[in-house]
C-alpha cells in the first residue's frame, strides 16, 4: 500500500435497492467520512454524497454514480483511502493515525525487539493489534490499550509492549 494513503473506511455491504452501502469508518466521528471529497480505492475514486450514522463506526452512505443494489454489491469489501496530506495535522505527540502503527517495531520494556505490528483491527469492542512475533514467526492479537502498550514513539517507529502474563 502507498504510505501516502490512509484508510478511512471499508464498504461492508449493500443497503437497500437504490445503491446505498454500509461503511465501517475509521474516522473519529463516523459521519466525517463524507467530508474529505473523493476517496480512493485501487484505480477508482468515490465521492460519498450523504451518510446516516447507524452505530459505532458504521454508516449508511450514498455514493455518486452508484444507483442500484447490483452496483453497490460490486463495492463490497472495498477499502476507502485518502491522501495523508488531506487529513488534519496532528499536534499532540500522543495523536496518530492507526495506519501509522502498521510495520512499527514492537519492543519489550527491556528494549528487546519482540515483533512488528502487521495490522490494526476493530471488531466492535476496541482496537486490536496483530503482532508478528519474531521468535516464533506466529501472529498474535492484543488489545490496544495503554496498559498493554504503554508507550508509542511515532518518530522512532516503535511501540513498547508490556507483555501480558498469559503470553509465553
Swiss-Prot record:
One Pfam family named in its UniProt record: RimM
GO CC terms of this entry: cytoplasm; ribosome
Key words, A-Z: Chaperone, Cytoplasm, Ribosome biogenesis, rRNA processing
GO function term, MF aspect, one: ribosome binding
Compartments where found: Cytoplasm
Record flagged with keyword rRNA processing: yes
Domain topic, free-text comment: The PRC barrel domain binds ribosomal protein uS19.
The protein's role, per its UniProt record: An accessory protein needed during the final step in the assembly of 30S ribosomal subunit, possibly for assembly of the head region. Essential for efficient processing of 16S rRNA. May be needed both before and after RbfA during the maturation of 16S rRNA. It has affinity for free ribosomal 30S subunits but not for 70S ribosomes.
Annotated family: Belongs to the RimM family.
The name this protein goes by in its record: Ribosome maturation factor RimM
